[in-house]
Each structure stands twice: as C-alpha cells, then as structure tokens.
Amino acid sequence: KVIMQMSKDKNALACSRNFDYIRSKPGKKELLLMMNCLGVAKSWSENPSWMYDTDFEFLNSDDVTCLVCAGPRAYDYQLRLLLAGIPRQKIRLAEDEFAALELLPLTPGDDVYLLYGVDGTPLAFRVREKLKEKLLAKEGAQ
C-alpha cells in the first residue's frame, strides 16, 4: 500500500505529528523522505535548525525498515536520522527523487509512505505514479 503524507517542510510540529502518526500505524513501513521546500531551492536557506526541533526519534522503530532520503536536503535528513539513533543500514540516499525509488526494497506486505513538502506536491504525485508502476511490475514478475 502506498500512502501519501504531506509533511510541511520547515515546520517541526507538522513533521513530528506525521512521524508520530506513522509510528502509530501497525505493520512494517518503508519511507521516502522528500520534504524539501522546492520554492527556495535556488537560494537555499542554510538554516536547517527546524530539523532539530522535529521528533525524528518517532521513526526509530523496528517497524520502520527503510528510510530513503531524497532531494536537495537528503544529506541533512541522513544526519538527523543518525542523531535520532536510527541505524545507518536502514538509511539510503538519493539526490534525485525518481532515483530514490530504486532504493526502496518494496518488500511485499510493507506499507510505503511518501512524505513530501507543500510545494513539492506535483513532484510527489509524479513519484507516486512511478512507484505504482514499479509495484505493478514487481507483482507481475512474481
């Protein structure tokens, strides 16, 4: 199952609430973190302090099997996940959101969460369509 989850980038409370919601859901989960404020990508802010007010620790769970950090903030997300105690082997990186799809294991039975920012909605829907294609192809191959 693919779940779209808008996580307002640069807003610690909004992201924390989404992470807590994901934690509360039963079953194994794979996450694609692409919560990037694309509107300021050309004049990118050097202030990622909101990430340190965000409860990434909610994602430090045995139920979360893979976290793929994608987009211009991929390395910032990786660092924050490591500081939250999430094992490095669960974290994968891709600067391109479509390339990030190749890093998801897509284990049968796992729910896949796409977490995206407000102005990244059109991109998130295009990524979701590619993900659906990958899932259908994987189903057909089995």
Positions of predicted regions on the chain:
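ATP-dependent carboxylate-amine ligase
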Residues: 1-142
